[in-house]
UniProtKB/Swiss-Prot annotation:
It comes from Chlorobaculum tepidum (strain ATCC 49652 / DSM 12025 / NBRC 103806 / TLS). Keywords: Cytoplasm, Glycolysis, Lyase, Magnesium, Metal-binding, Secreted. Its main location: cytoplasm. Mg(2+) binds at D251, E297, D324. The gene is eno2. Its cofactor is Mg(2+). It comes from the Bacteria. Pathway: Carbohydrate degradation; glycolysis; pyruvate from D-glyceraldehyde 3-phosphate: step 4/5. Binds a second Mg(2+) ion via substrate during catalysis. It catalyses: (2R)-2-phosphoglycerate = phosphoenolpyruvate + H2O. PANTHER family: ENOLASE. This is Enolase 2.
Amino acid sequence: MSVITRIHARQIMDSRGNPTVEVDVHTESSFGRAAVPSGASTGVHEAVELRDKDKSVFLGKGVLKAVENVNTLINDALLGMDVTEQEAIDAKLIELDGTPNKSKLGANAILGVSLACAKAGAEYSALPLYRYIGGTTAKTLPVPMMNVLNGGAHADNTVDFQEFMIMPIGFERYSDALRCGAEVFHSLKSLLHDRGLSTAVGDEGGFAPNVESNEQAIELVIEAIGMAGYKAGAPTDRGGLGDGHVMIALDPASSEFYDAEKKKYVFKKSSGRELSSEEMASYWADWASRYPIISIEDGMAEDDWEGWKMLTDKIGGRVQLVGDDLFVTNSKRLAEGIEKGVGNSILIKVNQIGTLTETLQAIELAKRNGYTSVISHRSGETEDTTIAQIAVATNAGQIKTGSMSRSDRMAKYNELLRIEEELGSTALYPGIGAFRV
């Protein structure tokens, strides 16, 4: 039977040592479990993560209220529903919450239930989750965005921009791309060590050395690519630009250094320089011409629509411009962006919107309008590998799930290796084809 018989949540710990929600969903013949991630730099338009705010327990970060909501209100409402009716389950969760941002029950409570139901449905159907969600066409392994060097809110250093990532695009198999990423990661570690820079890793497994400038940060990554025996740049089949194996992706997380009162981007961790929206867009255009950059996420602040339009007009034809804080996995905000012609890609974080159905709707809306989708982790993760399954299920072609260290990050990469093995000769690795620029 596929009828839900019990839903139970508990408080567990995430990769940063903070509490998060884990949910078990039972039917008479299947079981699903999901753990919920949490972000450090969060967009103001995200669905609400419910925390207890009792400073005497876990410094206010407990999630027992969210757990209680699952074990009482949600459990009672969903008992007897068919676990394979995902859209009906998610609609019921949204109705039960009744707020536009899931602030009553908590997006962390709702998401845990939504994903656990999907897993129980997949088990009942005797299918892997990617096949259960995506059907027989689900066979594309994603190109990894590997966060190898950190700054901004993710590091205590003098780098303004949050993430410097490598994307191994010049390969025919996911497993070969993963090997490349690992070799570049270890080469970067050696490079930093030899220069007396820190090789400690941050929340997402990337290094956070105290380098002299933002430029030095990206140049270190490019040097490490060469040191590992690879070439930074595009492959030959992309406009005849060369025989590159690896390109650079950035997540400056510009909302974090945008001063809304001044309407300026303030490089407060490095030079103190202040740039207008137009100057910031020109800054990224300059970087895109100087460095082998294929993707920039949140290059402008989340509510700087004019700045986003300037940036898109300048480099949107040759660089993937990903909206994270801008779109927050929300179809309404994505539709607004499409109408205004800003960005050309959306970052997909399941906990920004709170249900699997709404997540899939955002991906579908992006696809219909020629925007790419990047399936993403959060800085606070667990051993849960659902996002790897979603990446393949939707043929998204790209995944952002950290560096080549920390088990919470490697769990997702390893799950993709298993899926590649399972798919055998039908598995596709898109490489540069994952991009529409």
